[in-house]
Amino acid sequence: MENQLWQSTLGCCSQYQESPQDAENILFLLLGLIILVNISINVTTVIWHGLQNAIDKMFSRMHQKTAEVQVTECPPKEPQPANVQDVHIHCVLDPVQVKMAQPTQCSSSSTHYFRKHSNDRRSRRRYCYPRGSLQIRQSNQQQSCHSRQQRLRNNRQFSHGYPPFRKQRQSHKASQTRPMPFFDLEDRDSLLEDDQSCPHPKQPRRSRGGLYKPVRLASNAGLWGRQGGILASLPLPSLYLSPEMRRLPKRVEAKSELRLQGFGPHYSQSRICGNVEAEQWASSPPPPRRLLPNPSWVTVGYSPFPSGGHIPYDARDQWRRGTEGCEPPPAFVSRNLRSDAQGYRDHSSSQAHRQNFPSYTHSQPNHSPPQSVGYSSRESHEVRRRAPDWSEAFPSRHPLTTSTSLTALGEASYQRAPTASSGLVIPHSSQRLAEGQISDPTPPATTFVPLSRNPGGNANYQVYDSLELKRQVQENRGRASSLPPPSTSASRPSLHRSRTGKLN
């Protein structure tokens, strides 16, 4: 029994001794597991960073390869760099063309040779022209002997208008020999290229107005190989121009020369009339009196004064001239809204007067220009005396493009009662014809003379200030007091004088 008890006690002690060893082993196992987990985490992080770097390197290499492939594939598809390089070469060669094509002065050898050659050809063909054009050309040759200062002064007067009839050759020479700015040189060369591509015939072509000779520019004489010049081995300078340079605006002189070459009786009536009036203004001495401008004849785009020397016309003369087969240039459209509204207000009162004239009906609004032009019966007779000249200058009829509002405006101003400020008594249109026939058969010619002042600095139009208008009104009043008063006439004021009478 004792042995059994001893063995049992020994077995219990051995059990108590084995239990702490198991606890220590468990702790060691836990520590090992923790260490292993930490090591594995560190290893995984290192591996992940390595994979990330490798992936980034792969993507960067792939992008570089794709970029290289795109760069290698693009050059055969687009040949644009070569064209851009050509345009750049053209732009570099432009200043060479500009420097070589410009004549230094109007007295250069090439210009002198060109003018002498044209004068010789004109003298050889003088017998081919009619008698009227022969006299005109003889007067042209006499006028070409004036000094260069006189030509420059005439060019300043007609720089923005149409050149006159008899000074056609002179204006050609002045526009050819006038030194041009830098941006106009390429236009000269483009015109030269067009001249060589489409050469003019040897004999002068016959237009509707007679014979004329095509005019060439002076830059092609002795420079680009016509006479074996310094640039005979080079092509035309316009070949070096880029499309951007060809789109530059043309110069005004070239357009005016083209207008002169298109001269004929069927070409624009207003242009011919402007040439006639400019010729009368330039050739005749300054007249002793002036005409007041009428704001109902204002050019479109500018108000309220006329832009140049336009001769005013009477409505009766206009109707008679239309029946005879010749008409003055068409009336300019008025943009004076206040006078137009006044014309519409007085339109109802003008119906009774319209019945006195069989030609001014509602079916013919295009043949009645504004009738209030502001001049006396003597001046209307002077305009009437120019009818044969008008019939020679205008063989074909062109209907006037006057609106109905302008017709109503002219008739309303025709019926308007005189104001206190208007001192000039104007007779009725039906009685003016008889008085004009009884009056002096040779009155002095009245020519419209614009002011020499130009306040705006732009030479496209002449501006009338208040002082000049006041002075002209006073002069017209003095002339009206000196003229014999009409016997029985319905007085009517001028539209312009009734408006500007407040200046007195």
From Swiss-Prot:
Q: Does the keyword Repressor apply?
A: no
Which species?
A: Rattus norvegicus
Q: Which gene encodes it?
A: Spem2
Composition skew (Basic residues), residue ranges:
113-128, 494-504
- Mind telling me which residue stretches traverse the membrane in this protein? 26-46
One short Pfam name that applies is: Spem1
Could you tell me where the Basic and acidic residues compositional bias lies?
Answer: 313-324, 378-389, 467-478
Q: Please give, as recorded in its UniProt entry, the membrane topology of this protein.
A: Single-pass membrane protein
Q: Where in the cell is it found?
A: Membrane
Superkingdom:
Eukaryota
Q: Please list which residues make up the signal peptide.
A: none
* Chief localisation class: membrane
> Region labeled Disordered — which residues?
103-180, 313-402, 431-504
Q: Where is the composition biased (Polar residues)?
A: 103-112, 135-147, 349-377
Q: Which UniProt keywords apply?
A: Membrane, Transmembrane, Transmembrane helix
Q: Name one GO cellular component term.
A: membrane
The name on file for this protein is Uncharacterized protein SPEM2
